Amino acid sequence: MTRPVTLTEPHFSQHTLNKYASLMAQGNGYLGLRASHEEDYTRQTRGMYLAGFYHRAGKGEINELVNLPDVVGMEIAINGEVFSLSHEAWQRELDFASGELRRNVVWRTSNGSGYTIASRRFVSADQLPLIALEITITPLDADTSVLISTGIDATQTNHGRQHLDETQVRVFGQHLMQGIYTTQDGRSDVAISCCCMVSGDVQQCYTAKERRLQQHTSAQLHAGETVTLQKLVWIDWRDDRQAVLDEWGSASLRQLEMCAQQSYDQLLAASTENWRQWWQKRRITVNGGDAHDQQALDYALYHLRIMTPAHDERSSIAAKGLTGEG
């Protein structure tokens, strides 16, 4: 079997942010993640959804997939200047074979200093509640200070409709954080656990303010040195409440800690092997002169898999799959 093709975003434009966030979305049928950028943009709609996790925000509102707290967002400041792609060249692609989304940027600050910023992430096909992210920053021609802030952002809404109450947020040791949130009708809980590990000599602290639980990492780098942040996320939800809240949250945290014993590449390899077996059984190949025909078929099958909750016969395919609210 030939390797499934990739989908590439040809250029960066704030007018197509949400188009490509849907086209290049990731998932595994249990969990869907829009392909939003790590940094913020005014027109960007972030989104993370669980199959079957619906809620009605209030009287007269519709029953809809809940937009979960965001775990992708990162604020990157280099020598005090906040990173943004507004005027920069770049490359971003979604690999259908592994489900990995990759982005590489060479960015220059206002003083002309250059930096390579590379990020990649995947939603695991091997362990359904797992998301893995990695970002590397390398100064090309000057010493620099780098600040990376990331965590769990529960200010996310369904276009202004808030479905979740913050039940419990906690930090464990130097690397672990967890937020537990409850739907406003009190029927369902979701636990979002994160592990952030950074290479090299860095300083770290945590803040919890205005529904944001964040880890802040600062590093001093010489030209050519690289700082790497690996972030693992484990997402559980329940609607039966058979276990005590703390016990249930601790069980999720233990699952995340087991994953954290492996590297990003090891976790990706297990997920890629799952995708390989899936494609081997289901891929349709086209013998023809137009490569777009094969890309269209691969794209359709990829999205069919990431939106179909094959793990749970009680869940159906939502109106927008797991790429958006509805």
Language-model-derived ranges and their functions:
Residues M1-G27, L31-G326:
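Acidic/polar, glycine-enriched structural segments that form the non-catalytic walls/loops
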